[in-house]
């Protein structure tokens, strides 16, 4: 107590009384504004809630919510089950696979009580805490599966919004989410995601929660979660499912509440090497399945952000177009550029009459001076007629690469059939 008083006195001496009070008021106002935004994005009005409950779907879309349990705190479990019971979409089942130990028999009691009241809740007590999610999937009867962790909560419209996308042909759906502590009003972070991007997913698992997918995507898989990817099983699962999905849809709404507490993954920010290794293995396996080969690396200093050094299929001629060069010594610029460029063979088309003192047997220099009436686009369009390269790089004469493998870095993406244009940071 004495040390606390000393700290307060020291703070008052340093800042006075007014500044801390003003800062506290500003923080309270900011929190109120943030809460308004949160409510705007994730709460629904009574009329909308009623409309969702009364909407009739032509298709019989049954969603099985899969939840593995292990020593789940009583209040967390009740909140989870109630969040599913409160769904505005009613064609669901909740599959609870319980691997809790004997000291947590209350988990079984609570689940059985709810299951007796609502037949849509299916509970199984497992003989051991292993493969709970996989086992729950085996007895699920829905054509679509949603994944809900045992200490989290669903937004009341979560299944309705997913069912709407399923009706429109989606077979893999993911939503935005919000981290919270004891109640959803006590939020700590809102996670608004981008739409599906293969390359972003290969760099980190940004999809996370809430995920609903068609059961047919599991065809040919022995299990959803693989033991060999323990530590990054969710990441491996998302990679495998999205490979097979035909229509992936992102719902830009907060439909999942991810609880933050002392024992949760959301609170544990430490990097575990086995999890990093498992993630790299999951990405490598994904590349093998898609026949896109490369080396997976950690994008240091961030160990859980990954980058792929794709193998080059071959070494085609790359044409580099240089324009807007304000230097009189274009030859000096090209010489410096070549020293900073490891890749060969190259073809350089430049806006000049001649280039001197550039000798490299694997580099062809083509001079194509720009007319005064031509803009850059017109010049490049005409210059292309002189090139023989399979790939084309347009480079301002004011730019210089910072790494010698800059062409390889761009080429390894450009060679992919699903990529048309590649750009770098300047």
Indicate residue ranges for each PLM-predicted region.
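Short aromatic/hydrophobic "clamp" motif used to bind/position activated sugar donors
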Residues: 145, 392
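Conserved donor NDP-sugar-binding/catalytic core segment of glycosyltransferases
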Residues: 157-188, 399-426
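N-proximal low-complexity "stem/linker" segments adjacent to membrane-targeting elements
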Residues: 22-83, 292-336
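Short, flexible, basic/aromatic active-site loop/helix in glycosyltransferases
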Residues: 185-206, 424
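Glycine-rich, basic loop-to-helix element that forms the pyrophosphate-binding segment
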Residues: 125-140, 370-387
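Conserved nucleotide-sugar donor-binding catalytic segment
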Residues: 197-284
């Amino acid at each position: 107590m004495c040390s606390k008083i000393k700290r307060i006195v020291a703070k008052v001496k340093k800042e006075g009384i007014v500044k801390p009070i003003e800062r506290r008021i500003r923080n309270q106002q900011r929190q109120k504004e943030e809460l308004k935004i949160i409510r705007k994005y994730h709460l629904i009005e009574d009329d909308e809630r009623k409309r969702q409950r009364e909407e009739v779907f032509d298709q019989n879309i049954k969603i099985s919510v899969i939840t593995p349990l292990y020593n789940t705190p009583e209040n967390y479990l009740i909140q989870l089950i109630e969040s599913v019971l409160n769904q505005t979409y009613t064609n669901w089942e909740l599959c609870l696979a319980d691997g809790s130990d004997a000291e947590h028999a209350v988990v079984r009691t609570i689940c059985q009580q709810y299951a007796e009241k609502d037949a849509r809740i299916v509970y199984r007590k497992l003989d051991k805490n292993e493969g709970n999610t996989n086992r729950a999937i085996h007895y699920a009867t829905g054509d679509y599966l949603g994944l809900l962790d045992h200490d989290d909560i669903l937004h009341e419209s979560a299944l309705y919004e997913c069912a709407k996308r399923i009706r429109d042909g989606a077979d893999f759906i993911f939503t935005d989410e919000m981290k919270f502590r004891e109640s959803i009003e006590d939020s700590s972070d809102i996670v608004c995601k981008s739409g599906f991007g293969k390359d972003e997913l290969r760099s980190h698992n940004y999809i996370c929660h809430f995920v609903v997918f068609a059961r047919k995507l599991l065809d040919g898989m022995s299990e959803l979660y693989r033991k060999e990817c323990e530590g990054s099983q969710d990441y491996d699962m998302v990679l495998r499912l999205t490979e097979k999905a035909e229509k992936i849809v992102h719902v830009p709404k907060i439909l999942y509440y991810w609880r933050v507490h002392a024992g949760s993954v959301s609170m544990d920010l430490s990097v575990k090497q086995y999890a990093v290794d498992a993630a790299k293995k999951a990405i490598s396996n994904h590349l093998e399945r898609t026949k896109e080969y490369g080396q997976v690396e950690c994008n240091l200093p961030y160990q859980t952000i990954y980058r792929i050094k794709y193998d080059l299929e071959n070494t085609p001629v790359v044409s580099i177009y240089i324009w807007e060069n304000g230097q009189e010594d274009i030859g000096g610029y090209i010489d410096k550029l070549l020293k900073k460029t490891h890749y060969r063979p190259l073809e350089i088309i430049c806006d000049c009459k001649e280039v001197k003192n550039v000798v490299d047997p694997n580099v062809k220099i083509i001079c194509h001076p720009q007319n005064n009436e031509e803009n850059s686009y017109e010049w490049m369009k005409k210059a292309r007629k002189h090139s023989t390269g399979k790939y084309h790089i347009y480079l301002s004469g004011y730019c210089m690469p910072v790494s010698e493998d800059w062409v390889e870095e761009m080429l390894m993406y450009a060679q992919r059939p699903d990529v048309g244009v590649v750009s770098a940071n300047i």
